[in-house]
Swiss-Prot record:
Belongs to the mitochondrion-specific ribosomal protein mS35 family. Keywords: Mitochondrion, Ribonucleoprotein, Ribosomal protein, Transit peptide. One of its GO terms (molecular function) is structural constituent of ribosome. Signal peptide: none annotated. Component of the mitochondrial ribosome (mitoribosome), a dedicated translation machinery responsible for the synthesis of mitochondrial genome-encoded proteins, including at least some of the essential transmembrane subunits of the mitochondrial respiratory chain. The mitoribosomes are attached to the mitochondrial inner membrane and translation products are cotranslationally integrated into the membrane. Its main location: mitochondrion. It comes from Schizosaccharomyces pombe (strain 972 / ATCC 24843) (Fission yeast). GO terms for cellular component: cytoplasm; mitochondrial small ribosomal subunit. GO terms for biological process: mitochondrial translation. The gene is rsm24. The keyword Lyase does not apply. Coiled coil: none annotated. This is Small ribosomal subunit protein mS35.
Length: 258
């Protein structure tokens, strides 16, 4: 079944009216008396006429905010406005983006370096400027086997020997673009150093101790198991004796009461 945003909008209205009917009538009437509502969103404040009473707009706004800060019906109205705004965007703005759709294309082999950054579109908080670059050492052109070996030595624990991948991250700067340029400088310097020191460090073995899986032997010693079985048998006998004694005490109490 295709998604119909207008039908969803009507359903949201029905759910909202059902929830609003459960709230207190006084709080709801107070909320609607201060604001008036259009078809889609809350509009401007309704100000009192000047001939009736002197008023200050700032003072009235602070009073209304204090009144509605702990009002459940007012919170439901604000939540409903956010939902309606999202449905309006899905109904009227998303169809306008269809000419800009692009089909997925697999990255070409010439794209050696892959940059990644987290962008949260639904959050108003500070964006995460961290950028991560991943690449395969064997895919870098113009490098001999000795130079690739030196490059693996230089990256250290950032090297994955199982997939021949290198993963480097940077959050030094407050902008993701600056961190990307910083990673590009690091990559160029790594390639230059691996070319320059290929003969000097070619005999150094590659240490992959950071990637070794430390298998934990969780088997219990047999001596401990034997002690545990004897201990449990002793506990069983003591518990049986205690339960037998409690039964005898209850029987004696019952006979004395009779």
């Amino acid at each position: 079944m295709a998604f119909n945003p207008l039908l969803s909008l009507l359903k949201a209205d029905a759910i909202f009216l059902g929830q609003l009917s459960k709230s207190s009538f006084c709080a709801t009437s107070r909320a609607f008396s201060v604001f008036y509502f259009t078809r889609f969103k809350r509009s401007a404040y309704v100000s009192a006429p000047f001939g009736i009473e002197p008023h200050d707009e700032k003072e009235l706004k602070t009073i209304d905010d204090n009144v509605h800060s702990n009002n459940l019906s007012w919170q439901k109205i604000q939540e409903h406005e956010v939902i309606r705004e999202l449905y309006r965007k899905a109904a009227y703005e998303l169809p306008g983006l269809t000419p800009y759709t692009q089909s997925f294309k697999k990255p070409a082999d010439s794209q050696i370096f892959r940059f990644e950054s987290d962008v949260q579109m639904s959050s108003f908080e500070k964006m995460n400027p961290k950028v991560v670059v991943t690449f395969k050492v064997t895919n870098i052109p113009l490098l001999e086997e000795k130079q690739r070996h030196v490059l693996r030595l230089l990256v250290g624990p950032r090297y994955n020997p199982e997939e021949d991948l290198v993963r480097i991250s940077s959050d030094k700067y407050s902008s993701a673009l600056q961190n990307k340029y910083h990673l590009i400088k690091i990559l160029t310097s790594l390639i230059e150093e691996s070319k320059r020191n290929a003969e000097k460090f070619s005999h150094v073995p590659l240490n992959t101790g950071h990637w070794k899986y430390k298998k934990c032997d969780k088997r219990m010693p047999q001596e401990w198991l034997a002690d545990a079985t004897t201990l449990t048998s002793k506990k069983k006998t003591t518990i049986g004796k205690q339960s037998h004694n409690t039964v005898l005490e209850r029987e004696s109490i019952a006979t004395t009461d009779e």
